[in-house]
Amino acid sequence: MYDTQVMIVGAGPTGLTLGIELARRSISFRLIDAAAGPFRGSRGKGIQPRTLEVFEDLGIIRAILKAGVQYPGFSVHIGPLSLRLGPMGGRKRATEGVPYPNLWLLPQYRTEQILRERLAQLGAQVEFGTAFERLSPDNRGVRVHLSSGESVTAEYLVGCDGGHSAVRKALGLGLRGDTLHTEAAFVADVHLEELDHTDWHVWPFAKGGSIALCPLPDASFFQLMSPREPADGIEAAILRATGCQVRQVAWSSMYRPAVRMVDQLRVGRVFLAGDAAHLHPPTGGQGLNTGIQDAYNLGWKLAHVLRGGPESVLDTYEAERLPVAAAVLGLSKHLYRTRSLKRGDATNQLRLHYRTSTLSLGKPLGRLHPGDRMPDVRLADDTRLFEQMCGTHATEFVTREGARILIRPDGYIASIGTQRVTSYAGEPTHVVDGSATDLDRSSIHS
């Protein structure tokens, strides 16, 4: 007898996304977090285009777009000279295939708040002040021991509890990789009224490194980034660089830039996701986004198996996400080493794919392969394909040539063929007439 189907440890963006995915499929779960209350810092402030597509499916894209802004341009200050540069990643126009082409700026605490509000709409909530202590796995489930003294038996446990993951440590798994800098770096949210709020300001140091202030959507707040905590205090360091007085320090944190990951994402009935499985430096805005993608990949698979689907489906979580984590870590490391302000298409996560997955079947159709992200297209009735895909179902897209593209619940192509597929992952497929569309024009793959 189980107390709940899934126990989720950690209520950051990864755990919240997983909770939403389970809640909208009517899977019972508990979502616990050791913190006394919600996270209040801006830390993971960059939301990539692929994550914005996920947020459309989760039903929160309007709230996310309303609360955030496009990334600002840079002002680099060297003595009396100020150079104004374009925004990170440039500014791209939305296309038929890519409705959200630009990196979106939103403080992490606000992203989490919107995710919690969506979770509440689905009838669930976070249990703050409840810590995971240890686990007792067996073949039928996982017994989770909590700081309250309670023991909970779940069919599956998912550790989404960050870089210092207690779940990962309980499994005996280590993080392999590199520490990129021997000294801890510093980040803080500061209130400045005198500094121009339209640009991301950077003051390079003569011996390397810089102090930077990125404007946040909240009026007059900036995210401060520094190679180390200023010896004479935040206020003095900012006054020295900018001539501006700090009105408030709302949040601050130290971190040691690293690229590290586990060798496996699953041990029996226990899974790891997000920073519990892979640690990223802040460069490239990959950490928060990769964790959300982990949860988005795992959620529908857990639900399918809990409804009677084959257990082997869960093996594809590690098979699909571990190579992605390795690739993203490599990109983050490169961006950190080069210190480049330029961002190419590699950071937007739109080209990540699962072509080698056992769930990807059939032959390519033009530039589209099984395992690719399905592009958005405008349909004959003037709706968008992504609108038709929203929900927990898989979608079957029928081309003008009669090919049938089966799209998984997470937006990736499961198969390309000619046979009608009536159900996928335990739910009826939704058929979409794509006879009036040009897929090659929408695809970003080659």
Regions found by a protein language model. Give the residues of each.
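FAD/FMN-dependent oxidoreductases across multiple families
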Residues: 67, 229-290, 322-324, 328
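Conserved FAD-binding catalytic core of PHBH/FMO-like flavoproteins
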Residues: 117, 156, 160-257
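Helical substrate-recognition/capping region of FAD-dependent monooxygenase/halogenase enzymes
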Residues: 1-5, 9, 24-25, 34, ...
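N-terminal Rossmann-fold NAD(P) dinucleotide-binding loop
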Residues: 15-16
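Core beta-strand elements of the Rossmann-like FAD/NAD(P) dinucleotide-binding domain
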Residues: 2-4, 147-156
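A conserved short coil-to-beta-strand element within the FAD-binding core of flavoproteins
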Residues: 128-142
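Active-site-adjacent segment of FAD-dependent monooxygenases/related oxidoreductases
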Residues: 43, 48-118, 216
